Amino acid sequence: MNIKSTWVVFLTLLFFIPFAPSLAADSSGTSMPPMQAIAAAIKKVAFSPSSSTPAKNDLKEHIAEQQEAIVFTAPPRETPEQGMEIYKPVAEFLSKTIGERVVYKHPGTWGVYRTEMLKGGYDIVFDGPHFNSYRMEKLSHNILVKMPERFEFAVIVLKEQKISTVAQMAGRTFCAHAPPNLGTLVLLSQFDNPSRQPVIISTNGWDNIYAGVASGKCLGGVVPVANLKKYDRAGNMKVVLKTQAMPNQAFSAGPRLSAEDQTKIAQALLSPDAAGPTAKLRAAYKVGDSFALANNQEYRGLAEFLRNEWGYY
């Protein structure tokens, strides 16, 4: 019975009958056998069975169907339409890889992204190293493949500025992406006293951050070293701080996927067959020709950059 028909029946009963009985829905749980570790690159993870409620109408059936699917997501850096264009081919490729339905789900907002992540609502995720590290430590995810180029950030000011240390920039303006962007969190981690932190002027795009510093809109900025080399060919900037290299964005998989399926996903994303399905993703994030194999150990400790972000700790 659809929603419109249900509403008509309800109004009819309300008119003729003074009281209507309430309906109760039963719920049942399913259990899965424990996983077996089948590959040295994939650590053994715990499986938490999900419970489902028998569908009573089309809406509940649709919700149940979505819950049963393996959910693939990425941060809301793109619009829902852009996200679908970039990530849906990857989801379809992974569906064929493991023989289960994988759906791409755009989170909508950063708040929803955080909330759903902490609830364990995402099974496969592509995002930054600090998020991968957090899911590994807190949500039993394994990190499968990564962008091969390592991440290094530079805190920059115009060359003529009489500034030589980050400490001198306390309370000053910085062009940077809004947190929880990793570059911004790396910058903020340099200031122990929150009252002495720089003022972040939210700026989208590394090129716009560089331009903001060059134009004098902001005293400083934080950009990847690779981007700085491209933008600052004239040598107008001074690097006040350069971070240690760290692993780049990566795919992680959670405990609803067996160790066998996680291995299949990693192998598939590294294979030549992934070239087509991942083409738009690789182009959007300048991955190069292919991803590289990742491991949990190299991401350990990077979750600390989320320590002062609300909701994570």
Regions found by a protein language model. Give the residues of each.
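N-terminal hydrophobic or amphipathic helices and topogenic motifs
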Residues: 2-3, 11, 19-112, 118-120, ...
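Bilobed "Venus flytrap"/periplasmic-binding protein-like clamshell domains
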Residues: 67, 73-95, 130, 152-211, ...
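Periplasmic-binding protein-like
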Residues: 71-77, 149-157, 233-273, 283-309
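Stable alpha-helical elements in mature extracytoplasmic
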Residues: 86, 90, 109, 113, ...
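Sec-exported extracytoplasmic/periplasmic mature domains
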Residues: 95, 99, 118, 192, ...
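Short helix-initiation/N-cap motifs at beta->coil->alpha
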Residues: 104-115, 199-211, 246-247
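Acidic, polar ligand-binding/catalytic clefts
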Residues: 107, 111-168
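A ligand-binding cleft/hinge motif common to bilobed small-molecule-binding domains
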Residues: 126-138, 212-237
